[in-house]
């Protein structure tokens, strides 16, 4: 028999803070680059096309002595049964023994690590003095993408939010953005007053909704796309030199958020080359022959380690295609398990 810890959603949220998650996700990227982490093939299955599906992302972090998986299912008719449409969990196992260490609610892990990825993309590829952030999408990920970027980019003065389907939703988000960001993310830093005040000051900026995506694109220094779109929202001719894109939404075949022609003039970076050309934002550009796999400059871990330069000049357009990899989930989940054990949170069963 061995102990197996199960951690509910509330406890997961209690144990995570964005600054630490950014550090964890960066470490996952660098472990992958150093061949101390690897991904297993994705599993995707539709139970009923357009109505119910599931996917499994898994991997092995030899540098952290863990392996595991994240399973996410989507059953579109669940809300009518008083059940969530999206359900997920992360399981972590010891790679030296194969013994499961624990599992937890997947939603807060996914939201935090996905937000972190967008902010990390800005950190390594955007111009350091960037002031204007455009967020395309005002859904569940919006606050996470903004907070991570405010942590990694200290000169942001304005956040513009665009929702392709509803200006009202973008406006509603912006109206309460400052309060929401403070409530969701600042509590863990109250014991570090200097950091708390720094982040509070970064949150106290301008938040503006827009229904003019062309103008917003023309003005943006950093653009984060976090939508389920299946067609381009941003066109190449709108993008000024020096713009950085963190593309978050395209995580399966068929999704697309930016004009594929942007890839012909941009420096392109990804979290995982195989995933990017098969399910990511990069897929369409490769599929249409606009670029090849070899045109991808590097995976982000190489840039973090200083092996590959990111931006070469202030005029470069940079694209970071973040498809989302299991290593992000696993390294975050392992951190949660360690913290939960310290604080005696969760339920421990003997298996």
Where are these regions (language model features)?
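Glycine-rich adenosine-cofactor-binding loop
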Residues: 118, 129-153, 162-168
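Rossmann-like adenosine-cofactor binding region
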Residues: 197-285, 290
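Generic secondary-structure signature for well-ordered alpha-helical cores
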Residues: 17-21, 26-35, 123-127, 151-154, ...
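Short helix-loop-beta connector
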Residues: 125-132, 240-241
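NAD(P)-binding Rossmann-fold cofactor-contacting core
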Residues: 152-200
